[in-house]
Amino acid sequence: MRKCPKCGGNMRDKQSKCGHCGYEVTDNHSEQLTRSLKDNKKSANIKARKIIPWGIAFFIIILLIIIFFLLKNFNSPEAQSELLINAVDNNDTQKLSTILSTQNNSVDETEATAYIKYIKNEVGMDNFVKDVNQKIKKLNESETKEADFVTAKNGENVLRVSKNGRRYLIFDNMSFTAPTKEAIVKPKYDATYKFKSDDKQKTVTAEKNKTTAIGKFIPGDYLLETKKETANGQFDGQLKFNFNNSNNETIDVSEDFNEAYIQVELSGASEIDKDTVKVKINDKTYDYAKAKEIGPYPKTNDITVSAEGEAKKKTFKSAETTVKTDNLKDKTKVTLNFDDDEIQSYVDKKEKEENSFRNKVTNFFGNFTTAMNSAHSQSDFSLVSSYLKKNTDNYKSTKSDVNSNRLFFIQQPQITEIIKQGNTFYVTGQALKENGQYGEVDYQLQGDGDADNLKVVKYSE
């Protein structure tokens, strides 16, 4: 095809007359037309060659702009902080664990849950978003500052925001880490704690009244489901701690377990010497004290309780009581019953017996104290040796004291109680003690059944 030189209409290559305007095309015109077509084609090719590079360059620029914005959406400091903020706001513990974990400290989902709760309660979501974005902006604009902290209402550091190199040579790579503190427990008794930490089962053994670390934790309000084992059994419950109640480097842990403490009350035991009472709970024995709480014991098992104590050196036992699980409380009072009539009958008998030889014991102490003081003043052990039971510790220590010429004075005791068991006499009285104070003293004497031939076996204050 070619063009008519007059009207520009289309003509076949061999056609000599234009079908549109009737113009006769000569060979000369044909040659001109061919040259014109070639020139137009050449001009078009030159234009095309000039336009294509610009088009490619424009396309590359557009592509780079698109790539930049895509990278910015996912890798800019603002985008990085948005991932953190969204994880906290949406309770996405898995994502938050990934963001906060470092090579030296793995954050599990339990910690992430506690962290989210703490941020929302102690920082506030709006404040958290504002503070994180402010720290990001300041770090971006600073050439020297490398890190900053987001804090809770009480001033506790909860998040460290820091620069950590660059991403794609363009954006600051931001690092988000949560500071850690050591959680410590101080049990009242030896205990072993088992709980989940770092997605693994952890076991911590703690000694009675000693501070023991259970691990390092990021800021949070924690409630760890825990099994505790003690000599009294196994307990289910929680270990609780909150960074609001933390120290500089540690957090005190409180315990909340299904524990029952037993408080024993005695009935029919007015004549029992309370200092001699022993309380038996299951297979363990404890010293008795009024209002004393004994335990803890698991609320999941029945508990058997009994007691025994002395009246006039004779041991009496209470009836045994079983406390069912349904009746076990945090503080469970248990009343133990002694046979009051039996005890009173025995006490009356012993007091009558005591009165029968009280004069003999009183006379013995009058002679003994005089002899003891004379022996010390004259440094002559023979003056008192006949009043002492030979080869006893008391005999040897008295002999040593007399021979040392140590100043000494012993006062005759005012007898308050005499208890006879076989040929042994237990005497309690009030006298001047070695420290110069007036108070209770105890003697153990040995003699025959009628309180004759008495000898001192033991003395204590």
From Swiss-Prot:
InterPro entries: Mem_prot_TcaA, TcaA_2nd, TcaA_4th. This is Membrane-associated protein TcaA. The keyword Transmembrane helix applies. It is a single-pass membrane protein. Residues 1-50 are cytoplasmic. Belongs to the TcaA family. Its main location: membrane. The lineage of its organism: Bacteria, Bacillati, Bacillota, Bacilli, Bacillales. The chain crosses the membrane at residues 51-71. Keywords: Antibiotic resistance, Cell membrane, Membrane, Metal-binding, Transmembrane, Transmembrane helix, Zinc, Zinc-finger.
